A protein has these predicted regions:
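Short loop/turn segments that connect beta-strands within beta-propeller blades
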Residues: 70-73, 116-120, 157-161, 198-202, ...
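Conserved beta-propeller blade signature
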Residues: 57-59, 103-105, 145-146, 186-187, ...
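Loop/turn residues immediately N-terminal
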Residues: 64-66, 110-113, 151-154, 192-195, ...
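Trp- and S/T/G-rich repeat-edge/linker motifs of beta-rich repeat architectures
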Residues: 31-37, 74-77, 120-128, 161-169, ...
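Residue-level "micro-hotspots" composed of small/polar
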Residues: 23-58, 79-93, 129-130, 170-173, ...
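Coil residues (strongly favoring Ser/Thr
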Residues: 84, 99, 122, 160-161, ...
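Residue-level detector of Asp-centered blade-edge/turn motifs that repeat once per structural unit
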Residues: 52-55, 97-101, 139-142, 180-183, ...
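Primarily the dimerization/phosphotransfer
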Residues: 799-843
Length: 846
């Protein structure tokens, strides 16, 4: 069966190629899949359903839980017997994003439930009489949510949060699928056949004549666009075009006769998921691609049985498999054709691709540093080194440079083994290393107008005279030459290491220095004259310079613009754009528009690091670049210049190592983390705060660059690279605004997807308004106490003073009395003495 399928893929490969080249959109023969499995955090590798919510998160329904993917982490939601607000059951059968109500509907093996984004919990629902729990949801064009289940159709009553009957007849058929076409007609797939219901007329309408014979045989259906119905019978699967009233049997030439799921990509082509992989049909219903599991190709599907297909808002295709978890194709990753290294058919024999040159028969010679010489014909079939080396008598595998001379003879520059000359019409190879007395390397090789072959490397610059048979290589200079280019009929330019650029007169063999560059310690890797009389000079340590023919620098491109200071290869396309392979991606420079587009692994490159002197343009305009892990080719007009959109969302908040959510009693989260615009923190919570976030761009997840600014702390934007979390410690009380924005390259920033989060940090209890009130009351109390104390003291002092004064007065009065009586007694004593004395004398004499 697989052999037959392969034949059909090959049969339609020409159609596929023409389609991809003419549309310039998806190159289906170059699609590569990435994978998410248990190793990345999935709870189960069987994926029954996939959808994307309003925020941009991708949801996976597995056999063991519900998962939310943000590009970095997989967040698992599982059933908990003790929690009625948890997921109803871990076996998920369908997912539906209700964009009108911002609700995720989940059909499980034990009934349905919905995920509430504001509270981050689940609500459970009952549909009376539903015996089978595979429920299909649909929002009609009128905004009515319908549920198709085992006993008919039900409508969601939003006010009462209940499902009520809709279009139920007495027989109550099992409705397996429900969809609305562009004419506001419902297509209803039931166990009793296919039906149609007009929402405008509010009545059932007859089926088109073409599909009436199949209605009772239909056992699976899917409306893959507003005008195309895919349905499966016992023997085949068909697509019915509603508008044109045409029917096509997609499986007539296939051994596969049924499908499980289907979706359309942004071009309108149909992806059909089957037990034997994915079949892609174009708008003419011709098979143009087949993807299945491959043990030899890691970028193929890792499992063939397909259970779900989904196209997200960015045109990425998500594939749910039975054993392989999630496979996904990133839109745009197909624009570069990859020629990988490996032992398999049509793989390069070497990993590090060095120089690539055009061959006489519209093919390419490809030099590798670790696998010898390869040849690519015009059908893009690779002849490996094992065969070529035997034919050409080549013994070395480390080939650094190639040159096809005027006679169509091939010259090879080798590492530490000089140069080889292969003469096709004689089938003879001349080894110039055997003719030389000095060890040399051919890092670059070129022919001048005088039939001289020049090659150079770390050990110097050498000359071979083709006119002389078995001519010994002549050492012209000890310069460490890494690049040679013909400037005019008699002048070569040589790029050297730590010696800048030198000019070589091919007649006089004189070598002179050219003071073009601002530094003399630059490692010149590539010199390229374009069609506008400009000389592009690449360095390995200081970016890219552009000179005019007079040697004046007219432009300079640095790491900030190119993503790397290491320039590996330069080539001009048919539109005068200059493509530059660097140590960190591929750049397209439009000097007229002043723009630079940079491409990385997120855009489909196999690796970001290109190799030296490895750029070539074929006569039809296709460009080839060598990397340290294989080779790529592309047509520049088909490469999309994309300024990706980001929608930054918070994915997790941690305070003092505790995860915060609306369901956490200690949390400060009033609603879903992803919907937060403002948070309030206590002093304790602000002591250690960690916020995780994602740009929700699944193409540039690994390369997304972030910048943030904390208004209230930062004056300028802080560029944090691909770090997708931020930590704060001991935030002082106050109000802040955290701003986060994203970019694919750190140069072009998407301001529209910026996230602003207002953060309010409450003061500690001893600095809170209540504390200040207490402090004020205490202060007033102290003032009052001081006042009372002072007043009491004053009164006491006054009383004491009064008592003292009274006592003094009494003492004074007593003293005055004593003095008075003393004076009186004195005054009385004197006369009495005068009276008594005579009396006493009288008495004595009596």
């Amino acid at each position: 069966m697989r052999t037959t399928l392969l034949k059909f893929v090959l049969l339609f490969s020409l159609v596929l190629l023409n389609t991809s080249l003419s549309t310039g959109q998806i190159q289906y023969n170059n699609i590569r899949f990435k994978q998410l499995s248990i190793a990345e955090g999935l709870p189960h590798n069987t994926i029954n359903a996939i959808t994307q919510d309003n925020h941009g998160f991708i949801w996976f329904g597995t056999r063991n839980g519900l998962c939310r993917y943000d590009g970095y982490n997989i967040n698992l939601f599982a059933h908990n017997e003790a929690d009625s607000t948890s997921l109803r059951h871990n076996f998920i059968t369908r997912l539906y994003n209700d964009s009108l109500r911002n609700i995720l509907w989940i059909s499980t093996d034990q009934g349905i439930c919905s995920y509430n984004y504001e509270t981050e919990d689940f609500s459970r629902y009952q549909i009376k009489g539903n015996t089978k729990d595979d429920v299909c949801f649909l929002n009609t064009s009128d905004g009515v949510l319908l549920a198709a289940c085992s006993n008919g159709l039900y409508r969601y009553n939003e006010q009462d949060s209940l499902f009520v009957p809709f279009l139920l007849d007495e027989e109550k058929p099992h409705v397996r699928y429900l969809a609305e076409d562009g004419d506001k007609t419902l297509w209803i797939d039931t166990n009793k056949g296919l039906m149609r219901y007009s929402l405008e007329k509010k009545q059932f309408v007859s089926l088109p004549t073409l599909i009436q014979p199949f209605t009772l045989q239909c056992n699976n259906a899917a409306l893959i666009s507003s005008n195309q119905l895919l349905f499966n019978t016992n023997n085949d699967f068909f697509v019915y075009h509603i508008q044109s009233n045409t029917l096509c049997n997609l499986s007539k030439d296939l051994e596969v006769k049924d499908f499980r799921c289907a979706a359309t990509d942004h071009t309108g082509n149909i992806w059909v998921g089957t037990e034997y992989g994915i079949f892609v049909f174009n708008k003419l219903y011709q098979l143009i691609a087949h993807y299945e599991q491959s043990e030899r190709d890691l970028s193929a599907l890792n499992d063939s049985p397909i259970y779900s297909l989904y196209q997200d808002k960015a045109h990425n295709m998500w594939v749910g498999t039975y054993f392989g978890g999630v496979n996904y194709y990133i839109f745009g990753s197909d624009q570069f054709q990859i020629y990988p290294y490996g032992a398999s058919f049509n793989h390069l024999s070497g990993k590090a691709v060095r120089q690539i040159i055009n061959a006489p028969d519209n093919g390419l010679y490809i030099a590798t540093e670790d696998g010898g010489l390869n040849y690519l014909n015009n059908k893009k079939e690779i002849t490996r080194a094992e065969r070529l080396h035997k034919q050409m008598q080549i013994y070395a595998k480390n080939i650094h440079s190639l040159w096809l001379d005027k006679d169509n003879s091939l010259w090879l520059g080798l590492f530490l083994k000089g140069a080889l000359h292969y003469i096709p019409h004689l089938n003879r190879t001349v080894d110039y290393n055997l003719l030389s007395d000095e060890v040399s390397s051919g890092f670059c090789i070129i022919e001048d107008k005088n039939d001289h072959i020049w090659y150079g490397g770390p050990s110097g610059l050498f000359l071979i005279d083709k006119k002389k048979a078995n001519s010994r290589p002549e050492k012209i200079s000890s310069l460490r030459v890494f690049n040679l280019v013909q400037f005019n009929d008699s002048i070569l330019w040589a790029g050297t290491r730590k010696g800048s650029i030198f000019q070589i007169n091919t007649h006089t063999l004189k070598v002179t220095s050219l003071p073009i560059l601002p530094h003399t310690d630059l490692y010149i890797t590539y010199i390229y004259p374009d069609s506008h009389q400009r000389i592009w000079i690449g360095t390995d340590n200081n970016g890219l310079y552009v000179s005019d023919r007079n040697g004046s620098i007219i432009a300079f491109y640095s790491k900030e613009q190119l993503g790397s200071n290491a320039i590996k290869g330069i080539i001009e396309d048919e539109m005068s754009n200059v493509w530059v392979g660097t140590g960190n991606g591929l750049c397209c420079i439009n000097s007229q528009a002043g723009s630079i587009d940079r491409y990385t692994t997120a855009d489909g490159l196999p690796i970001n690091q290109f190799n030296y002197s490895s750029a070539c343009k074929k006569p039809d305009g296709e460009l080839y670049f060598g990397t340290i892990n294989g080779m790529i080719s592309f047509y520049p007009e088909q490469v999309r210049s994309v300024n990706p959109r980001f929608n930054i969302a918070l994915t997790a908040i941690w305070s003092n190592s505790e995860y915060m959510s609306p369901n956490n009693e200690k949390a400060f989260i009033p609603s879903s983390i992803s919907e937060l615009t403002e948070i309030t923190l206590t002093h304790e919570q602000a002591q250690s705060l960690r916020l995780e976030y994602s740009g929700l761009n699944y193409q540039y997840t690994d390369n997304t660059q972030y910048a943030m600014k904390m208004e209230g702390i930062d004056k300028d934007w802080q560029f944090v690279g691909n770090q997708h979390q931020v930590r704060f410690s001991n935030l002082p009380s106050g109000r802040y605004i955290l701003k986060i924005k994203a970019s694919k390259d750190g140069i072009h920033w998407d301001e529209t997807g910026q996230k602003d989060l207002a953060i309010r940090v409450l003061p500690p209890w001893w600095l809170s308004p209540g504390a200040y009130l207490v402090y004020a009351l205490l202060f007033l109390l102290i003032i009052y106490a001081a006042y009372r104390y002072t007043k009491t003291r004053i009164i006491l002092l006054m009383r004491l003073k009064t008592e003292h004064e009274q006592r003094v007065n009494i003492e004074n009065m007593n003293q005055q009395k004593i003095n008075f009586f003393t004076y009186i007694s004195h005054d009385l004593k004197t006369p009495l003495t005068l009276i008594l004395s005579p009396l006493q004398l009288s008495l004595i004499h009596i």
